[in-house]
Amino acid sequence: MSLENKVKNEYGNIAGIVVLKNDSVVYESYFNQCSENEPIHVFSVTKSIISMLFGIAIDKGYIKNLDEKVIDFFPNYKIKKREKTIQHITIKNLLTMTAPYKYKSNPYTKFFSSADWVTSSLDLLGGSGKIGDFRYAPVIGIDILSGILINTTGQSVLEFAQDNLFSPLKISVEKNVYFRNKEEQFDFYKSKGINGWVADPNGTNTAGWGLSLTTMDMAKLGLLYLNKGFLYNRQIVSEKWVSESTQVQSVWETRNLKYGYLWWIIDEKDCSFAALGDGGNAIYVNAKDKIVVAISSLFVPRVKDRVDFIKNDIEPIFKFN
């Protein structure tokens, strides 16, 4: 069965696939009336872009190290009475999903109706949970990282990304995207062609979701990491950060999943890692075989595993070419 037929028969929500081998495009195809120039909301792939921005912020001296306490970046934040945990949570805890939160189930309605998603996240950080235990925070909590970037660089997250990551890679992310109600938010989830990055009412860009990229944009970001942070004759992210952020830093033991700094570690033997988002969005890098696979997808609630698709159906075609 051809790759195109496989997509149409089993992975019907895929918008585009780009495969790079040895820095060259060896496959590029689009589906569902999508085109190469249409950005797609990539959901949690956004997290790995935030990881890149933290590497750049550290390289430029805005942030000293990952052991700095989160609360130190928010001097005006008033810690709740009897709170004894938030004071000890570090940037590294946020990047490795080893920070505790006070909620059991995500309080999305209350969170998204607030004007300041960073403060709302701080209000939910800490509590009685144990620092160091893996707890994946898909949306609520991760925006604290955006607040840290803003408070250290003096720029919005989008501005900092445009200057230091997107522009050097010739990636266009035009504007902040705002929602007036939940209907607009759900419409955005299913949309294609909106060029921007979701922001809260204060203008703070989301850290865990909300970025729109074309499939080729995603491939470029993967290629940047395949090449150890160097692309277009420029060291955009330090080699040290690329290596550190794509090594195992924490483990989601109940699911046997390994995590770096906002990157999923797929296979340590072939040095493969991935940025993964809802709906089946993926940036996959196999450093050993010099392969990058980018898959953009239109949102549906449940999809077949993209890593399995890449490893079983895409990699074997191009591995030895």
Located regions from the model:
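Structured C-terminal helix/loop/strand segments within mature extracytoplasmic catalytic/sensor domains
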Residues: S272-N321
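Catalytic-site signature segments of enzymes, centered on catalytic residues
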Residues: E36-N37, K104-R180, T204-W209
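Active-site helix/loop module of the DD-peptidase/beta-lactamase fold
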Residues: K60-A99, T152-G208
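Flexible, glycine-rich surface segments
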Residues: N176-Q185, G193-V237, W241-V242, T246
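Active-site Gly/Thr loop motif
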Residues: F186-N205, S243-V292
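A short, well-structured edge-of-sheet supersecondary motif
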Residues: L3-C34, E183, I283-Y284, K290-A294
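Active-site-proximal loop and beta-strand segments within enzyme catalytic domains
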Residues: N5, E10, E36-V42, T46, ...
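Alpha-helical scaffold elements that line and support the substrate/ligand-binding pocket
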Residues: D23, F43-Y62, L94, R135-F166, ...
